[in-house]
UniProtKB/Swiss-Prot annotation:
Reactions listed under catalytic activity: D-gluconate + ATP = 6-phospho-D-gluconate + ADP + H(+)
Annotated GO MF terms: ATP binding; gluconokinase activity
Entry keyword set: ATP-binding, Gluconate utilization, Kinase, Nucleotide-binding, Transferase
EC code(s) of this entry: 2.7.1.12
One GO term (biological process): D-gluconate metabolic process
Family, per entry: Belongs to the FGGY kinase family.
Leading EC class: transferase
InterPro entries (UniProt xref): ATPase_NBD (IPR043129), Carb_kinase_FGGY (IPR000577), Carb_kinase_FGGY_CS (IPR018483), FGGY_C (IPR018485), FGGY_Carb_Kinase (IPR050406), FGGY_N (IPR018484), Gluconate_kinase (IPR006002)
Pathway(s) annotated for this protein in UniProt: Carbohydrate acid metabolism; D-gluconate degradation
Protein's recorded name: Gluconokinase
Annotated residues for binding of ATP: 16, 261, 300, 412-416
Activity-regulation annotation: Catabolite repression by gluconate.
Amino acid sequence: MTSYMLGIDIGTTSTKAVLFSENGDVVQKESIGYPLYTPDISTAEQNPEEIFQAVIHTTARITKQHPEKRISFISFSSAMHSVIAIDENDKPLTPCITWADNRSEGWAHKIKEELNGHEVYKRTGTPIHPMAPLSKIAWITNERKEIASKAKKYIGIKEYIFKQLFNEYVIDYSLASATGMMNLKGLDWDEEALRIAGITPDHLSKLVPTTEIFQHCSPEIAIQMGIDPETPFVIGASDGVLSNLGVNAIKKGEIAVTIGTSGAIRTIIDKPQTDEKGRIFCYALTDKHWVIGGPVNNGGIVLRWIRDEFASSEIETATRLGIDPYDVLTKIAQRVRPGSDGLLFHPYLAGERAPLWNPDVRGSFFGLTMSHKKEHMIRAALEGVIYNLYTVFLALTECMDGPVTRIQATGGFARSEVWRQMMSDIFESEVVVPESYESSCLGACILGLYATGKIDSFDAVSDMIGSTYRHTPIEDSAKEYRTLMPIFINLSRLLENQYTQIADYQRGLITHK
């Protein structure tokens, strides 16, 4: 009898459920969105119950459509870095505080500068930053004492879901390694990190491998989801590490680059490793597979800003003609030669995570002359996003013990031929676009196949995932980028103090409004 597998990806803007055949073909996918509550510049929260209902209803839509298809297991992918404070009655004291919430910025700075933060990073693998639960919980225990005094647990969104399903507080090693509080070598909570956070191990969930299987789901919830309560649930991992699995970037030297709204670059190694300069993360996939890399804030949001602020007339024409506005932007960029005639754009419109880990950095054009036109600025912005990812790539290659063999490119940007070729030229590497568009859900299911013993290694992934586009570097273009890249990198270093000064000035404008 043919069996099927269900991958569920709990994301920041929506939850996706995808039903796959066991050879990786998509049978059906469902998605339910939910709001991100941002009442001010620093707050980014969600309602955990809305997310739980999205998990139930995406699954129910699929099982209702395919009642005859036997689901052999359900496996989970989840966004990282969320925090929910829970009281002694297992009820939330806070909304779900997401990775994008910056209210713990002051505590992240204090941990980094005064509380031995770099040594904590080297043991835990998560750069000290407001995104990390370590910073968020330290902020709650020190500045929100009315919450901390009632908090029995601090959990993430996947832990909240599994508590509803199985009445247990459990966290997989992958999500735990993204908290800033798990010792990578000991696979246990780090004493010093917990001391900084102001909590004990009892405040956190039980640590389990990403391959841990749960059964005996709550009968009431199983009915709502349309599944057998004995269906195996694989706890799974974080969306980032599973994306590498889902695009077949798992062998030594293979790198996955994703650009959606934000972006990331990652590779898999066989044992945990951190960076002496603190530029990259190290998260668990399994005990033999660890993912190192860096996330960037400024991906597609830069293109959206260019679209809205620089190209309103072109976009209006595109809309009337039924053409995708982003296709128009990339066509405009094609009119300019690589390097934008010496115009550089630092794409830091939303601060930046890797490799700078500085929320105060700001965007800028450099090299403007009278001969530069709008199309130069558009191309420079596209190039700036890739330049920035390349600086993360350089940090990553310093931590790898061999050469890069290929780059797997995914996310919205992979649909643009201009951007794909630009990446190949700047990175001076072959760029391949895999056939998978649901990489985190597929990655969760591949991990599920491994957990349930249906495959004994991840080598089977290559049979599931073909490729659609392949680009190799154009030497003349690569030469231009080789000349400009050191200028791009040096500028961001030289402006470090000025970034802080201008960010302070901008914050002052907000408080005086």
